Amino acid sequence: MANVHVKRPIIGISMGDPFGNGPEITVSALSDASVYTRCRPLVVGDYTSLSYACRVAEKLGRTAPVLHRIESVEDAFFTPGTIDVLDLGLMPEDAIPNSLNEETPKPFGVGASKLGGEAAFQYVKTVIELAMQREIDATVTNAISKEAINMAGHHYSGHTEIYAHYTNTSKYTMMLAHDALRVVHVSTHVSLREACDRVKTPRVLDCIRIANNACKALGIETPKIAVAGLNPHCGENGMFGDEEINEIQPAIDLALAEGICIPEKAPTPPDSVFSKALGGWFDIVVAMYHDQGHIPLKVKGFVYDRDADRWQA
């Protein structure tokens, strides 16, 4: 059983959609020996998909790790140059090319599929179960196709909702972080029209509380929280929308009464809140919807290299 006090925690990595980029990202990341100085990683996925990803790496002139198929966490080597794979055996061998020179058979490489969605869902479910059983200390997830998991009959809008369901968590939110910039969201994977409808006092208050507790868990004794407005200029006293007046401000007032630190004591205009956060005014921002929080964080955290035609973190 994993001990949370060990210097190198055991990290369970869900492989992601086998027909997506998860297998290649996993192989690339675990080819870096320095990863093993910080943690003990193992992959929950399929040996066949990772084998193909290793062949892709070799074709690109990279040194591919050796795959070690395991049946339980106790079987793992946790050795640089070796990837421990808890193989769920969900991918038929004929779904993955035997050679990089042959035409890729369906459904490999053709986008969302029921087969890929079912496999990806089971990888995520398994790492959650391992964590709940304390066999691993933390989880890391690769990308899944939300369309594919729904095709497979698992009706979730993303990882966050899957984790909430299998951990019996009723109040939760997605948090993104890059360096000192942290963001939680009142809503995520819903239409913009529905996102506006979800800005309600109880939900905003829940997210403020979650943000406060998350920062404390990260070692910030008295987190300074910003709560973004929804409308341009926070609605200009109702000229451009009244959510700030009727929903967001009441949540802020209730949070302040609980002793939560919200320095501005009011919604912060969305077009300036992240600049202030980057300048150190706030430890975390409560964003009202998906893109309001995701765009600034991804602008900060990712750079597109035009010459190399790829993203760089």
Features from the language model and the residues they span:
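Contiguous, glycine/small-aliphatic-enriched amphipathic segments in soluble metabolic enzymes
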Residues: 1-159, 206-226, 230-288, 292-313
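A generic structural signal for well-ordered coil/turn residues at beta-strand boundaries
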Residues: 79, 171, 180-182
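A broad detector of the eukaryotic-type serine/threonine protein kinase catalytic domain
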Residues: 168, 188-191, 232-235
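Conserved beta-strand scaffold positions in the cores of enzyme catalytic domains, especially
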Residues: 84-87, 174, 183
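FAD-binding core/adjacent interface of flavoenzyme oxidoreductases
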Residues: 164-176
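Ligand-binding beta-strand-loop-alpha-helix segment within the catalytic cores
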Residues: 176-206
